[in-house]
């Protein structure tokens, strides 16, 4: 990923996040999903960011349960931490949008890696050709 990549907002709205403490209450959070991260705010004005989950640190999105009232899902990070969320109904479908954003991010990263590898190979070939042209 290059510094010139611009994060575009894919989805914005409310999610409920299960707290990490012993009582595990559900707390409503304002969330903004971009092409690079899921930003979680403690307030609706988005002044106080409580967490930023970079897509590169997310391993997968698991849909745990779908009840009549909520869709429950878990984000699993690359260090195997599980963060539980729920959204009010299927129309919100945050889990699907996050999963698609994750796949798109991984595809962009793979393409960038492939391009970098090809550029490196082409540079190496060019250097070899110049060396061979100088040889007696």
From Swiss-Prot:
Residue ranges of domain PH in the record: 9-103
A GO CC term assigned to this protein in UniProt: cytoplasm
Family recorded in the similarity comment: Belongs to the PHLDA2 family.
Gene Ontology molecular functions: phosphatidylinositol phosphate binding
Alphabetized UniProt keyword annotations: Cytoplasm, Membrane
GO biological process: positive regulation of apoptotic process
Pfam families: PH (PF00169)
Entry keyword Ribonucleoprotein: no
Localisation per UniProt entry: Cytoplasm; Membrane
Topology versus the membrane: Peripheral membrane protein
Chain's role: Plays a role in regulating placenta growth. May act via its PH domain that competes with other PH domain-containing proteins, thereby preventing their binding to membrane lipids.
CDD domains: PH
Annotated SUPFAM superfamilies: PH domain-like
The protein, known as: Pleckstrin homology-like domain family A member 2
Domain of life where this protein originates: Eukaryota
Gene3D superfamilies: Pleckstrin-homology domain (PH domain)/Phosphotyrosine-binding domain (PTB) (2.30.29.30)
